[in-house]
């Protein structure tokens, strides 16, 4: 085991991580050996639910298909290509990201968060596109990898584009 720090969204800011290896991991019929893992230590306190374990098939070299309607994930070394409604290039550097445009001209990388409920931008991106903080903020309860982000708020009237996907006058 070795130790490192990670910066994430939330009250804690920098958080300790232990880098380790799982000797064996079984997921249904799939058996994996020597799986690299992160141990979040110390655990977060005063959060509404216990932190969940996470798995990244991409970090193990697998492709994946997520079917939300069937509540099913399929992953493997070689999957048949399925035609999607939209296709765009992914970048994988620790997190999976796609390139997007904010308010017509500002390029930004967005983390692909399959469990996310909103599209979010950073405060730096909001400043770069000239959006001022509204006088009256709609506070959000955002939970990041380092706990609650008490400064998060909803910013209305932002236009977003991801390849052929467009959202105009959208709250982020």
Kindly give the residue locations of the regions a language model identified.
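Pepsin/retropepsin-fold aspartyl endopeptidases
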Residues: 1-172
């Amino acid at each position: 085991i070795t130790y490192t720090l990670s910066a994430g969204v939330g009250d804690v800011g920098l958080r300790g991580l232990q880098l380790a290896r799982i000797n064996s991991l079984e997921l249904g019929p799939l058996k994996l050996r020597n799986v690299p893992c992160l141990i979040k230590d110390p655990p977060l306190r005063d959060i509404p639910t216990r932190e969940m374990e996470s798995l990244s098939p991409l970090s193990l070299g697998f492709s994946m298909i997520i079917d939300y309607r069937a509540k099913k994930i399929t992953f493997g070394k070689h999957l048949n290509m399925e035609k999607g409604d939209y296709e765009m290039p992914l970048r994988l550097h620790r997190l999976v990201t796609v390139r997007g445009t904010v308010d017509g001209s500002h390029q930004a990388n967005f983390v692909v968060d399959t469990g996310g409920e909103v599209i979010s931008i950073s405060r730096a991106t909001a400043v770069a596109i000239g959006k001022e903080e509204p006088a009256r903020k709609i506070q959000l309860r955002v939970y990041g990898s380092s706990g609650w982000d008490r400064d998060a708020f909803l910013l209305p009237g932002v236009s977003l584009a991801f390849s052929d996907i467009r959202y105009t006058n959208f709250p982020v």
